[in-house]
């Protein structure tokens, strides 16, 4: 679980990187479909599933919008993300293992885009936070 120190570190990092969330989302989603090509199956209804394509950019923006929401709901991720959990479980039918895959890609992108801000403390806190987000999103799968 997230300590108060972790929560403060996530909020502090987000205050510095949040304005770049669209670029982070595009890069993270682009990285995911290249490094983990099996994830492309979730986007087979798109005319083009390539890094940086308009659909990837748009979905990356949505994903990071969800992360931004999670930052505001950091004290109760399960309740705060319940609608997103329901959508991913029943409508989109995303395998929850893919949340961890995308989380890893988000961490890699943030570390490369913001090396000064991505301190060891920020890394640990953000990793724990994203794991909490993944757990909250997987809640409705049970």
Swiss-Prot record:
Any GO BP annotation: hydrogen peroxide catabolic process
Domain Globin: 1-142
Modified residues (N-acetylserine): 1
Tissue: Red blood cells.
Binding-site list for O2: 59
Binding residues for heme b: 88
Pfam families in the cross-refs: Globin
One term under GO cellular component: blood microparticle
Keyword set, alphabetical order: Acetylation, Heme, Iron, Metal-binding, Oxygen transport, Transport
A GO MF term: oxygen binding
Biological role: Involved in oxygen transport from gills to the various peripheral tissues.
Comment field (misc): This fish has five hemoglobins: Hb C, Hb O, Hb 1, Hb 2 and Hb 3. Hb 0 presents the strongest Bohr effect while Hb 1 presents the weakest Bohr effect.
Subunit annotation: Heterotetramer of two alpha chains and two beta chains.
Family: Belongs to the globin family.
Record protein name field: Hemoglobin subunit alpha
Species in which this protein is naturally found: Pagothenia borchgrevinki (Bald rockcod)
Gene name of the encoded protein: hba
């Amino acid at each position: 679980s997230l300590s108060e120190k972790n929560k403060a570190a996530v909020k502090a990092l987000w205050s510095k990187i949040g304005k770049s969330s669209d670029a982070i989302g595009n890069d993270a989603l682009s990285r995911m479909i290249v490094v983990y090509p099996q994830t492309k199956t979730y986007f087979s209804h798109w005319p083009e599933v390539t890094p940086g394509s308009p659909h990837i950019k748009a979905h990356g923006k949505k994903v990071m919008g969800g992360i931004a929401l999670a930052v505001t709901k950091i004290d109760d991720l399960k309740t705060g993300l319940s609608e997103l959990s329901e959508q991913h479980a029943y409508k989109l039918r995303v395998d929850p293992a893919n949340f961890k895959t995308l989380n890893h890609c988000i961490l890699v992108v943030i570390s490369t885009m913001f090396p000064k801000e991505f301190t060891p403390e920020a890394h640990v806190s953000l990793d724990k936070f994203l794991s909490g987000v993944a757990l909250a999103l997987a809640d409705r799968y049970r």
